[in-house]
Amino acid sequence: YHKYLFRPRILVRNMYLRKGNLYNQADFYKSLNAFARAGVWQSTNIVVEEVKSKDSSNKLDLIVQLIPAKKFGYEASLEASYSASSNTNSVTAANAGNLLGVSGNISFLNRNLNKEGIKMTNSLLAGVEFNLKPDSNNRKNLINSNEISYTNNISFPRLIFPFAKFSSDKRFISTESFITTRLSYINRINLFNLQSFNFGV
């Protein structure tokens, strides 16, 4: 616990109980839920202890116990699909047939970017679709289409500009902002190529 893993403001932001204030059970559960919802700790607990001192009657100490989760995470997946088509449309017949699609996705997660509980996910997806059936001229394009895309998602545990001023308002129990960027390339053999860029807040 001597390691400087988090900036103090992330702790203050999730704590609804304040020094010198009257103890409130609702604020206790709000604080506990806020720490659990942050997603950067694998275990969260708040211990309430009565101060045992003659000159400190009716006072409580709150001990916040937080066990950090692993900062980095990885995830990989593989998917396959199959479809049979008897399309005779003159425009798309060249790509009709028995289609087998295979795609793979790998994601890298940073749960505590800049020591502020900011989560950033980088994902890379690649896929290819095979045509297992010859066309009407008995010609066969083995690869029907291919695709590759990259997605970056950043999740802030607070409101960001232009709504940042509302982050400190305790009426907002849960505030979160997202910035998502996506680049993709799709190649449909003999039909079209599509490059796209998406950005969202």
Task: Give the label of every model feature segment.
Residues 87-91, 132-138, 164-169, 191-196:
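Outer-membrane beta-barrel translocator domains and adjoining extracellular loop/strand segments
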Residues 68, 92-96, 110, 138-142, ...:
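Outer-membrane beta-barrel proteins
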Residues 113-120, 158-176, 191:
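Short loop/turn motifs that connect adjacent beta-strands in outer-membrane beta-barrel proteins
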Residues 1-91, 125-126, 130:
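Periplasmic polypeptide-binding modules associated with outer-membrane biogenesis and secretion
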Residues 58, 98-102, 142-150, 193-197:
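Residues that define the transmembrane beta-barrel architecture of outer-membrane proteins
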Residues 67-69, 107-113, 153-159, 184:
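Structural signature of outer-membrane beta-barrel channels/translocons
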Residues 71, 81-87, 111, 127-133, ...:
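Sequence/structural signature of outer-membrane beta-barrel proteins
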Residues 76-82, 104-106, 122-128, 150-152, ...:
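Transmembrane beta-barrel strands of outer-membrane/channel proteins
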